[in-house]
Amino acid sequence: AATWTGPDSYKLRPDAKRFENWENNYAARLGLGVAADYALRVGLQEIWDRIQALAARMRKGLGAIDGVVLRDIGATQCGIVTFSLEDIPASGIKESLMAYDINVSVSGPSSTLLDAMRRGLPEIVRASVHYYNSEAEVDALIDAISEISAKRN
């Protein structure tokens, strides 16, 4: 936030309020409330269990593919499955998956610099599941990565 001091000038506040926006996005606030109500109706534990099951299915399937290296660590893992494929950059995997109508994202070492440096991580693929995904969608990703991996040889 700032004080408007003239037609072509303003003075920024010296405190943290300088980072506040004046306007509020009421539609987003209402949407957040509706989304929270919906999640509570579905059940947070049910959502958690579903995400865990789908992510475990994906990790198991990807882990069985020659050349795939799963990059997830930790005792409790989330619905974001990170992996790489030997000899193919993550951006190439993402591009190849687009032909299968599968969307993933790519995370470069700079997005998690300390962890990437410590673990020697390359650019990695991030495949995310949510409770509304189906087993068939997870299997389609696994099958597509299997085909992409087979073309490496």
Residue map of PLM features:
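Pyridoxal 5′-phosphate
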Residues: 1-153
